[in-house]
Amino acid sequence: MVDVELKVSSQMLADFLTFLYPPEEDGILAVKSDVFGKLLVAHLRGSDIPVTARSGDFVVKLRMPINDITRHFEKLWPYYNEADEASLNMALAAVFDMDFTGYYRKGESLGYQKKDIVDAFITSRKLFSADCFDVLHKRVYRKGQASFEAIKQRLIRKAYYIDESIDYKGLGK
C-alpha cells in the first residue's frame, strides 16, 4: 500500500475528492486508475527519509492503486511538493468545473430550474461545506450574465449590420 497526503485548496474540493474516491474503512481515500487518479500517481515523489506530515485544514490522505509505478514507492516515503500540489489543485478544480458544467447543462436541457440543479449537484456529490451552496449559485449567475452579455453584443452587431445594409446613413449618424 502506498499512502500519501495531499493538501487541497478548499473544503469543497476536499469533499469532491471524497466523492471521486470514497474512503475505505480506515478513512483513507482509495484512488482509482481513472484520469485524475493517473495524474495523482504521475506527480508522486519518493523520499529516502520520512516526510513530515502535512498540516492545515484541507489535508486528505490518499491510498494509491497498486501498479508498476506505485510499486516503486513501497520502499520510499511518498509525498507531493508544493508545485505538485498546486498543479494537482488546478487539475482537480478543472475536473470539478467540467463535472459541474456538464451536470448543469444536462439539467438545463431537461428543463429543471437553476436552484434545483445546483441543489441536486451538491447533494449527489456530497458537497456539504458551508460555502459550497453560495459558490455554485454565484458561479451559475456569473455564467448567465456572461452569456446574456454575449447574446446582447451579437444582437447589437447584427442590428448595425442590417441597418447599414438598409440605410446607408447608419444607426449612429
Question: Which residues fall in each region the model found?
Answer:
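Short, solvent-exposed alpha-helical "recognition" segments
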Residues: K138-A150
